[in-house]
């Protein structure tokens, strides 16, 4: 309504409806015991992304997936991505409404999450995780080709996009600008931090050059 002034009894109003709604929602969420577990599962999913991007970068143009440790890092990334994302999907609805553990499997809450930006991103992420499994197994058996590069590149970009386009930047008024910027940031962090993680797991095998790669 034009000219309406939003307020809440007992608080100082900012004069904007968005700020008031955000304030109320935050107070409701703070009452939920799911905040810490939800944050942990978000980190687990992000760690899975880092491992997958690290494997992608270090394996590019090589037969490095022949290495049991590198393949283990890739499969571990898929498992973490799936487990963290599905846990976030289940917990998100109850956390938003201030609910507890007894509310996580309520159909209404899960349905609300499924139709949100985050829910759609997680569903896409699950599909991409299955594709990661197939591609990792395929590239383990086949020699590297230009098609391998396309598969790896597309999967990496799309998986990172499920994080960038469901996070805070995608909710901004200039989401068309900030979401792609966040995607670039995630890609850069994933290539660097993920690469370091994979090196920590399989550094000796990579350094030996036994699989067509060298550091």
Indicate residue ranges for each PLM-predicted region.
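Polytopic transmembrane helical bundles with strong interfacial aromatic enrichment
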Residues: 1-215
